[in-house]
Each structure stands twice: as structure tokens, then as C-alpha cells.
UniProtKB/Swiss-Prot annotation:
<keyword id="KW-0687">Ribonucleoprotein</keyword>
<dbReference type="InterPro" id="IPR018269">
    <property type="entry name" value="Ribosomal_uS13_CS"/>
</dbReference>
<comment type="similarity">
    <text>Belongs to the universal ribosomal protein uS13 family.</text>
</comment>
<dbReference type="InterPro" id="IPR027437">
    <property type="entry name" value="Rbsml_uS13_C"/>
</dbReference>
<keyword id="KW-0689">Ribosomal protein</keyword>
<dbReference type="InterPro" id="IPR010979">
    <property type="entry name" value="Ribosomal_uS13-like_H2TH"/>
</dbReference>
<keyword id="KW-0496">Mitochondrion</keyword>
<dbReference type="GO" id="GO:0006412">
    <property type="term" value="P:translation"/>
</dbReference>
<dbReference type="GO" id="GO:0005739">
    <property type="term" value="C:mitochondrion"/>
</dbReference>
<dbReference type="GO" id="GO:0003723">
    <property type="term" value="F:RNA binding"/>
</dbReference>
<dbReference type="GO" id="GO:0005840">
    <property type="term" value="C:ribosome"/>
</dbReference>
<protein>
    <recommendedName>
        <fullName>Small ribosomal subunit protein uS13m</fullName>
    </recommendedName>
</protein>
<dbReference type="GO" id="GO:0003735">
    <property type="term" value="F:structural constituent of ribosome"/>
</dbReference>
<dbReference type="GO" id="GO:1990904">
    <property type="term" value="C:ribonucleoprotein complex"/>
</dbReference>
Length: 241
């Protein structure tokens, strides 16, 4: 047995058995593409578990993270974006990140990079429409950026995110208070100011953050619901703030 990432992989004696048991949907052509992209000359089944202590576990760890652990459609969707971006066009992924590939310049292989970006753009559009509905292109982009910035603050600056969340709840409890949320400014990272009595917040972040973050996931969908639930005549008079 092989233990990786605090998970015991049962009956895994080689990379080949790992593919057949832990990576559903991976067949021979996919394995050959990996071997070609990462320039592995030896077959995967030659690396046994007993030799993995001396062998670099990066390759196996890479597969274990990107492939889903079951046949759930949500895990499969999460893996599709990785397979489309790395497996199908590893060179394009390197060029997109501004990194050289096999000694080439970053400006080369433009056609494959263009095709890869088209596939990724269509994939993102489909996912955004599933989350936010059939909104226009600009609204989709704004919603996606607002959700991303809100999640970024929650994951990296949780104390500031919680302070903004408490400030929002405190403001909404007041009577005759209209809470304005500027989605355009939030999508550009212009988040305003915190209260001067904020504790545990640096001066730099006080100038960047107010009640524009601190929301639950999907807050933009609820915020835009009123805009797209009215008639066309009234909709023309409304605008995102």
C-alpha cells in the first residue's frame, strides 16, 4: 500500500495500477499524452512502490491532486478544466504563464495557445451561465470578478473579511439605511475604506476595504435578481451600482 497526502491508496503497486484504480476515465491514449508532454521515456509500470522512496513523488502527487476521487459530476467538472489546460496543451499552458517550454521562446506556438484560450473561454462561459443565469457578457464578467475578489479576501485576509461582514450586519440593522454595493468598483478592486476604529487591520488594508466584501458565495446572483426580474421598460431605467 502507498500512503500519499494522508490517504492510503490500496492495491496500488505502480503508476499503472494508480491510473486504473484512482483515476476514472483515464485510458491508454491519455497516459501516452502525459508521457509525451512530460518527456518520460520509461513506462509508468516500471516504477514500483518499493522504489518510490528514492523516486521523485511529484509526478504521482500531481495526478492525485488533479484527478477526481470518484465519478461525481462536480469533481469531473473540476478536473476537466485542468485536463483541457495542461494535458491537452501543456505547451500552451507554459506559454500562457510566460514560461519557456523545451528551450523555446514564449512567443512561439501561438496557434495552439489561441485554440487553448478559446476552449477555456467557452468552458468558463458555460460555468458562469450555470451559476448566474443567462446574463449578458459584461454582467457575467463583473459577477465573476466580484465573487473572486470576495473569496480571495476570505481565504487570505479572513480577519479583515470578517470585520467587513460585521460592519455590513451592523449597518443593515439601522433604520432608514440604504446599502449601496458598487459591483463595477468591486470588480476592479476599488473597495473603499474601513472604519477608523478597526482593530487588527493594517493601515494599507484600511484604505482598500469596506462593506464590499464579507458576503456569502453567490451574493451577486441575489443582488442582480431584481434587475432581471422586472419588465424591459423598467429594466432600461435600472443600472448596476
Amino acid at each position: 500500500m502507498l500512503r500519499l497526502n494522508d490517504v492510503v491508496l490500496k492495491d496500488v503497486v505502480s503508476y499503472h495500477s494508480f491510473f486504473s484504480k484512482q483515476a476514472p476515465g483515464v485510458k491508454g491514449p491519455t497516459i501516452e499524452k502525459f508521457l509525451k508532454r512530460f518527456e518520460y521515456n520509461a513506462p509508468l509500470d516500471l516504477y514500483q512502490v518499493v522504489d518510490l522512496e528514492d523516486f521523485n513523488l511529484f509526478f504521482l502527487d500531481f495526478f492525485f491532486k488533479i484527478f477526481p476521487k470518484n465519478l461525481s459530476i462536480f469533481d469531473r467538472q473540476a478536473a476537466n478544466i485542468v485536463t483541457a489546460n495542461i494535458i491537452w496543451s501543456y505547451r500552451s499552458w507554459r506559454h500562457f504563464k510566460g514560461l519557456p517550454c523545451r528551450g523555446q521562446r514564449t512567443w512561439s506556438n501561438a496557434s495552439s495557445c489561441y485554440r487553448s484560450n478559446l476552449i477555456l473561454r467557452d468552458y468558463k462561459k458555460k460555468n458562469v451561465r450555470k451559476i448566474f443565469g443567462k446574463y449578458g457578457g459584461p454582467e457575467q464578467k463583473i459577477c465573476f470578478l466580484c465573487e473572486y475578489i470576495n473569496y480571495l479576501w476570505k481565504s487570505q485576509w479572513f480577519s479583515e473579511w470578517m470585520h467587513s461582514r460585521k460592519w455590513i450586519k451592523y449597518t443593515l440593522k439601522k433604520k432608514k439605511v440604504v446599502f449601496y454595493l458598487d459591483l463595477y468598483a468591486t470588480s476592479k478592486g476599488l473597495l473603499g475604506n474601513l472604519r477608523s476604529d478597526a482593530k487588527g487591520v493594517t493601515k494599507k488594508k484600511k484604505k482598500m476595504l469596506t462593506g464590499h466584501v464579507g458576503f456569502d458565495q453567490g451574493f451577486t446572483k441575489i443582488y442582480l435578481k431584481a434587475k432581471y426580474a422586472v419588465s424591459k421598460k423598467v429594466r432600461r431605467k435600472l443600472s448596476l451600482r
